[in-house]
Structure formats: structure tokens, C-alpha cells
Amino acid sequence: MPWIQLKLNTTGNQAESLGDALIESGAVSVTFQDTHDNPVFEPLPGETRLWGDTDVIGLYDAETDMAEVIAMLEYHPQLGKGFIHKIEQLEDKDWEREWMDNFHPMRFGERLWICPSWRDVPDPTAVNVMLDPGLAFGTGTHPTTALCLQWLDGLNLAGKTVIDFGCGSGILAIAALKLGAAHAIGIDIDPQAIQASRDNAQRNGVSERLELYLAKDQPADLSADVVVANILAGPLRELAPLISVLPVAGGHLGLSGVLATQAAGVAQAYEDKFTLDPVAEKEEWCRITGIKK
């Protein structure tokens, strides 16, 4: 169905208040967007971190009387009469279908392809992971996921056990299994990620070789030949004591979700227990890998 979009510009510390006002005026959803397209990384738990110059965007049903909405919002103390705004009619689209149409098979390394479950595989002889991301992060389109997939493709995983710490959609654990790993373990804090990983494992015929745990339930004695963690720099630093004990001696560690500018700080948290490789970069992101001493 078609929608009406109302966009306001404000400062970060006023954005949530204006978002509440849009909901009260009849918006069915509100989103926040940086006016200058700068990313915000690693909000603290429970924190909604916003930009200094923020667009507040409300989505309204096409039948909404926007003159009435504007009149109502003029009483808001941060706005007032004649406040600056932009109203736009959004065309009627099947947004889910549009997203699906833009998600294409992607190749990583020499052998590995990640293919949307609704598309044909381009090379039936390759190692193909059929993926439906669902609500969990991890499609291969993000540079950090790509860096991890390329790294896994370059390892000899035959007969190995792999831990995917922060498994999201399960893409890394499933790719490892399809690349020859005997067993994989996926860990995440989000139940939706566990479900998405389980569904994707079934789709790829590897369910019997994949264990999945919420982080609070993971066994204390887990270990693996290969450990990959594609999360964020802050958690990688904070969880270094936990992650560092997971690889066996001589095992491989791969870390991503890290901006290139954060690489040194993350590497420092692991350098005592690992012989680290040169950092690999893709766009503004990087991957840190090493061997357990």
C-alpha cells in the first residue's frame, strides 16, 4: 500500500521526543537517520545513540490528513508554528520483494558461493550455501561477513570443529560445514539469531552437525580448531578472556566487525595468546586472524 512520509530535522538529544510526538500524531512507524550519512557504531546496552544532526522520519497511512498532523505538531515545544518539514508520497511497492530482487548470489574466495534461497545457484559444482537471512544479521553483503567468508574459504577445514561466536544468520558456521568442517557450534545472545541459524542449517542439510546455544547457556568446556567472531570491536575487547580460551593450541582465530581504526586496540587484547597475522582490510573494515600459541 502507498504511504506518506514526514521528515523533520533536529538535534540528536531531541530526536526521541519528536519521534514520540510523531507516533502520537498517527505515524505507524518512526525511524532516525543521520542527516549527513555518518554511521554510529557500538551503542551501549539499552542505549539509542543518535547523531548531532538527525532526521526524524514518520510513516503515515496514505489516507492521513497531513494538514491535521502538522497542526497538531505545531503545539510541540520543539517545533512551533511554521516548523520546517518535508512531506513525500511513497509509491506502492512490495518492499520485501524489492529487497529480495536486490539480493544476488555472491562468491567468496575460490570455492564458496552464498546464494539467496529463492535464486538458482550459478555454479552447481561449487560450495553453495543457500541462505534466508530472516531477521538476523549476516548475508555476505557486509564487508565484515565477506572478510570472514574469504578467510574460511582459505582454510583447510576438513574434519575440524568450528565455533561461530555471534552467529547471526548462521552464515559462517554453515559455510564452514559446507567447506568440510566436521562439526560447528553457533553462539548468539539473540533467540532470533538462533532460530535463523537453525532454519538455514536445515535448508543446507547440515542441521545434524550444528549445535546452537544462547550465550547464557553455552557449555563451559567448549573448544574448537577454528573460532570466528564477527561482532564489534567493543565486545571483542571485553570478551577477549572468554574468546581466547575457545581455540585449541595451534587453532585458528578470526575476528571481524572491526573498523580499521579499531584494529590495534582489538589486536592488543589477543596478542599475548595468539601469533597474529597482518590485518586484512576491506573498505573501512578489517579482519584480525592468528594462531593460538
From Swiss-Prot:
GO MF annotation terms: protein-lysine N-methyltransferase activity
Gene3D superfamilies: Vaccinia Virus protein VP39
Pfam annotation, one family: PrmA
Stored InterPro entries: Ribosomal_L11_MeTrfase_PrmA (IPR050078), Ribosomal_PrmA_MeTrfase (IPR004498), SAM-dependent_MTases_sf (IPR029063)
Signal peptide (residue range): none
Broad class of where this protein is predominantly found: cytoplasm
Top-level class of the enzyme under EC nomenclature: transferase
EC number: 2.1.1.-
Catalysed conversion reaction: L-lysyl-[protein] + 3 S-adenosyl-L-methionine = N(6),N(6),N(6)-trimethyl-L-lysyl-[protein] + 3 S-adenosyl-L-homocysteine + 3 H(+)
Function, as annotated: Methylates ribosomal protein L11.
Similarity comment: Belongs to the methyltransferase superfamily. PrmA family.
Name of the featured protein: Ribosomal protein L11 methyltransferase
Upper taxonomic lineage: Bacteria, Pseudomonadati, Pseudomonadota, Gammaproteobacteria, Enterobacterales
